[in-house]
Amino acid sequence: VNLTIILAVLSVGLWSGLLLSIIAPVTAFFFTGSPIMAAIPLMFPAVMAGNAVLAITVWYFQKKTSFKWRLPAGLIAGSILKAIFMGVVIVLIILPIFGDNIALKLPKPEALPVVLATAKVTFSITQLTTALIGSALAYVIWMPLKKYLKVEN
């Protein structure tokens, strides 16, 4: 998802990346049926906003700065800011307030502490890792792709 959002921003523009930021969590939910997302609908806008942070940061560094390594810097900054945003909003605010709702969606409600611990890692450390991996892949794909897109225009 991160790779797709980044490539959309770089090749089509900010609005396409923002659109994907909104669509991706909903689409993912339809395929995975996450009990956490089902139990706490407030997670959807939080994930959407985290994706948007990545898109806006990459766009800002690419379009509004002029130093040599602006794209790698934007990719790294966007990944870090996304993880921080999601860590604060989801891990420190949403899960402590609404975490008990998850037990209602679990086949074994007694598994709630393990599910919450996993969710805290998923929405912080894992977000950073996947955003950095997506950023690295986007960079590798973007370098030859941008030359092709310039030729086509």
What is the predicted role of each segment?
Residues 1-153:
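Loop-helix junctions at membrane interfaces
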